[in-house]
Amino acid sequence: MALDLRNYIASIENYPEEGIVFRDISPLMADGEAYRQATDRIVQFAKDKGVEMIVGPEARGFIVGCPVAYELGVGFAPARKKGKLPRETVKADYSLEYGTASLYMHKDAVKPGQKVLVTDDLLATGGTIGATIDLVEQLGGVVVGCAFIIELEDLHGRDKIKGYDTLALMKY
């Protein structure tokens, strides 16, 4: 029986600052059946696209992407923060409220032409996922889709990833 995954998301008012509602996926991850169903829905989306590699940004993109990669029998490549990868990397910058941040991937993480699904827990402004897509494309990969557990529609992150088939299991 399909679960209503919204029942497994904690909403914390005024966190991390006044006026913000933080959507916490920890209860979903803590419940085996809810986590399985969320993963299975993303796996089905990926199967329909012939995905050959999953890429997820640090750190919650790992939580979403790794079980999907396992179920599909494909690899997982992390997009990490500065100083976390030991070999030669490519870099993509993205905007924060005050300044910029960067993500990195190993230069051999994705093969040219490889069909990639980019995963993360949350689509907010689209900055992190946009940088992750940029990294995959720098390496010659083909982003065939993006998948999220939650999308915060008021932040218009989908506008930054127009042209990419996108799945959000829940929208707030």
Swiss-Prot record:
GO biological process assignments: adenine salvage; AMP salvage; purine ribonucleoside salvage
Keywords of the record: Cytoplasm, Glycosyltransferase, Purine salvage, Transferase
Entry keyword annotation includes Cytoplasm: yes
Pathway: Purine metabolism; AMP biosynthesis via salvage pathway; AMP from adenine: step 1/1
Keyword Glycosyltransferase carried by entry: yes
Compartment list: Cytoplasm
Domain of life of the native organism: Bacteria
A GO cellular-component term linked to this record: cytoplasm
One Pfam family here: Pribosyltran
GO molecular function ontology, one term from the record: adenine binding
Enzyme class: transferase
Enzyme Commission number(s) from the entry: 2.4.2.7
CDD domains, alphabetized: PRTases_typeI (cd06223)
Catalytic reaction annotation: AMP + diphosphate = 5-phospho-alpha-D-ribose 1-diphosphate + adenine
Classification via Gene3D superfamilies: 3.40.50.2020
Similarity comment: Belongs to the purine/pyrimidine phosphoribosyltransferase family.
Subunit details: Homodimer.
NCBIfam families (UniProt xref): apt (TIGR01090), PRK02304.1-2 (NF002633), PRK02304.1-3 (NF002634), PRK02304.1-5 (NF002636)
Record function comment: Catalyzes a salvage reaction resulting in the formation of AMP, that is energically less costly than de novo synthesis.
Listed name of the protein: Adenine phosphoribosyltransferase
Organism listed in the record: Ligilactobacillus salivarius (strain UCC118) (Lactobacillus salivarius)
Upper classification of the organism: Bacteria, Bacillati, Bacillota, Bacilli, Lactobacillales
